Amino acid sequence: MLGLHGRKPAQVIVEPVAKLMIKLKVTPNQLTLVSAGLTVGVALLLIPTGHLIWAAVLTGLFAAFDMIDGTVARMQGGGTKFGATLDATCDRITDGALFGAITWWLVYSYDAPQALVAASLVCLVASQVISYVKARGEASGFTMDGGLVERPERLIVSLVGLGLTGMGVPYAIDVALWALAAGSIYTVVQRLVMAGKSPLAKEFTKAPAGAKADYSNTK
């Protein structure tokens, strides 16, 4: 949702940084890898050890580099297909690391009830499925724009919940995870419905390589 409407306001901050990266001859792929490495490192080091405020601030800061690499690519005439694949892969890794670290902290430090741990695991799995449904739908030629809970929403809600919990606000992470779990399940269904309503939805797919394509004469 924010992915569609939040880019233009953010460009006011992102574009000057992107221009600096170009002057320093930093490539989009380098930015992608550095951003992912720092985000994963901060999440896995700070969240399980209970440094929630710093984890929220630094994870949010490093994750913001995900916008800079794309802007650098566009300023240089457009990104490559490999760059897009690398970026999507790193996004999945960072999402998994974030919710994996949150789940680890819930179990070993927060003394969370099993239901909340389950909600965190739902967020972890759904973060991957939401992106996969979009990627698979677009590969089939469907238009898959939008969705209630996309990556920006996941990051904002989870990191705000972590930060507020670190400040002592009761049940902040509980509310954040339950909201994300419910919203993520809804988004998976929303995107499947979107794919099902596409004009191309009932077209037949090609048989996999080596598989028999026509069984019409089979008795």
UniProtKB/Swiss-Prot annotation:
<feature type="binding site">
    <location>
        <position position="74"/>
    </location>
    <ligand>
        <name>a CDP-1,2-diacyl-sn-glycerol</name>
    </ligand>
</feature>
<keyword id="KW-0808">Transferase</keyword>
<feature type="transmembrane region" description="Helical">
    <location>
        <begin position="31"/>
        <end position="47"/>
    </location>
</feature>
<dbReference type="GO" id="GO:0000287">
    <property type="term" value="F:magnesium ion binding"/>
</dbReference>
<comment type="subunit">
    <text>Homodimer.</text>
</comment>
<keyword id="KW-0443">Lipid metabolism</keyword>
<feature type="binding site">
    <location>
        <position position="91"/>
    </location>
    <ligand>
        <name>Mg(2+) 2</name>
    </ligand>
</feature>
<keyword id="KW-0594">Phospholipid biosynthesis</keyword>
<keyword id="KW-0444">Lipid biosynthesis</keyword>
<feature type="binding site">
    <location>
        <position position="80"/>
    </location>
    <ligand>
        <name>a CDP-1,2-diacyl-sn-glycerol</name>
    </ligand>
</feature>
<feature type="transmembrane region" description="Helical">
    <location>
        <begin position="177"/>
        <end position="194"/>
    </location>
</feature>
<feature type="transmembrane region" description="Helical">
    <location>
        <begin position="93"/>
        <end position="110"/>
    </location>
</feature>
<dbReference type="GO" id="GO:0008654">
    <property type="term" value="P:phospholipid biosynthetic process"/>
</dbReference>
<feature type="binding site">
    <location>
        <position position="70"/>
    </location>
    <ligand>
        <name>a CDP-1,2-diacyl-sn-glycerol</name>
    </ligand>
</feature>
<keyword id="KW-1133">Transmembrane helix</keyword>
<comment type="similarity">
    <text>Belongs to the CDP-alcohol phosphatidyltransferase class-I family.</text>
</comment>
<feature type="binding site">
    <location>
        <position position="69"/>
    </location>
    <ligand>
        <name>Mg(2+) 1</name>
    </ligand>
</feature>
<keyword id="KW-1003">Cell membrane</keyword>
<comment type="function">
    <text>Catalyzes the conjugation of the 1'-hydroxyl group of D-myo-inositol-3-phosphate (also named L-myo-inositol-1-phosphate) with a lipid tail of cytidine diphosphate diacylglycerol (CDP-DAG), forming phosphatidylinositol phosphate (PIP) and CMP. PIP is a precursor of phosphatidylinositol (PI) which is an essential lipid required for cell wall formation.</text>
</comment>
<feature type="binding site">
    <location>
        <position position="66"/>
    </location>
    <ligand>
        <name>Mg(2+) 2</name>
    </ligand>
</feature>
<dbReference type="GO" id="GO:0005886">
    <property type="term" value="C:plasma membrane"/>
</dbReference>
<keyword id="KW-0472">Membrane</keyword>
<dbReference type="InterPro" id="IPR048254">
    <property type="entry name" value="CDP_ALCOHOL_P_TRANSF_CS"/>
</dbReference>
<feature type="binding site">
    <location>
        <position position="87"/>
    </location>
    <ligand>
        <name>Mg(2+) 1</name>
    </ligand>
</feature>
<dbReference type="GO" id="GO:0016780">
    <property type="term" value="F:phosphotransferase activity, for other substituted phosphate groups"/>
</dbReference>
<keyword id="KW-1208">Phospholipid metabolism</keyword>
<comment type="pathway">
    <text>Phospholipid metabolism; phosphatidylinositol phosphate biosynthesis.</text>
</comment>
<feature type="transmembrane region" description="Helical">
    <location>
        <begin position="154"/>
        <end position="171"/>
    </location>
</feature>
<feature type="binding site">
    <location>
        <position position="87"/>
    </location>
    <ligand>
        <name>Mg(2+) 2</name>
    </ligand>
</feature>
<feature type="transmembrane region" description="Helical">
    <location>
        <begin position="53"/>
        <end position="72"/>
    </location>
</feature>
<dbReference type="InterPro" id="IPR043130">
    <property type="entry name" value="CDP-OH_PTrfase_TM_dom"/>
</dbReference>
<dbReference type="InterPro" id="IPR044268">
    <property type="entry name" value="PIP_synthase_PgsA1"/>
</dbReference>
<feature type="active site" description="Proton acceptor">
    <location>
        <position position="91"/>
    </location>
</feature>
<keyword id="KW-0812">Transmembrane</keyword>
<dbReference type="Pfam" id="PF01066">
    <property type="entry name" value="CDP-OH_P_transf"/>
</dbReference>
<feature type="transmembrane region" description="Helical">
    <location>
        <begin position="116"/>
        <end position="133"/>
    </location>
</feature>
<keyword id="KW-0479">Metal-binding</keyword>
<feature type="binding site">
    <location>
        <begin position="29"/>
        <end position="32"/>
    </location>
    <ligand>
        <name>a CDP-1,2-diacyl-sn-glycerol</name>
    </ligand>
</feature>
<keyword id="KW-0460">Magnesium</keyword>
<protein>
    <recommendedName>
        <fullName>Phosphatidylinositol phosphate synthase</fullName>
        <ecNumber>2.7.8.-</ecNumber>
    </recommendedName>
</protein>
<dbReference type="InterPro" id="IPR000462">
    <property type="entry name" value="CDP-OH_P_trans"/>
</dbReference>
<feature type="binding site">
    <location>
        <position position="66"/>
    </location>
    <ligand>
        <name>Mg(2+) 1</name>
    </ligand>
</feature>
